[in-house]
């Protein structure tokens, strides 16, 4: 099995690849921006951390943008943090166009609703499973995962919502559709629960 971890110069790429190697020691995990490698892989992971305008610009500059879009159509696909946000139509940060694969936007946590909570949302928080999914196998609803973000996805289609979290507001932190699963939290930083989710992704047959 070949797993492509898309490298477009933003964030936590190596920690994601190391976590995948740990849960799938027999897999070939390749950190790459090569469109040919991405298209030839069996599974694709798009991590990312930072500002959405920078991430979208870097993805385009890397040459991997179209290969990532193609992967969302026909391969098991995992988006992490910005890799989740970019699937939507537009990010509030810099009024940035996303890939437009999913209807909805990416707003900032509303200051009026935060009641003294700091933004960015940084640290451990509970994830409530909104519906069953193969990637939740062996993970309890309410399990804690690690977050670092100031913006969150707001899907137009409530049917996409697969996990939610509370931080001043209730927000979507996991979505799924067909071969796509994406999370706002960082499984590679989330210890046993995060490794279980990555292991489930490696074994997933959508």
Model-derived regions, located:
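Short acidic/histidine-rich motifs immediately flanking catalytic phosphotransfer sites
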Residues: 38-48
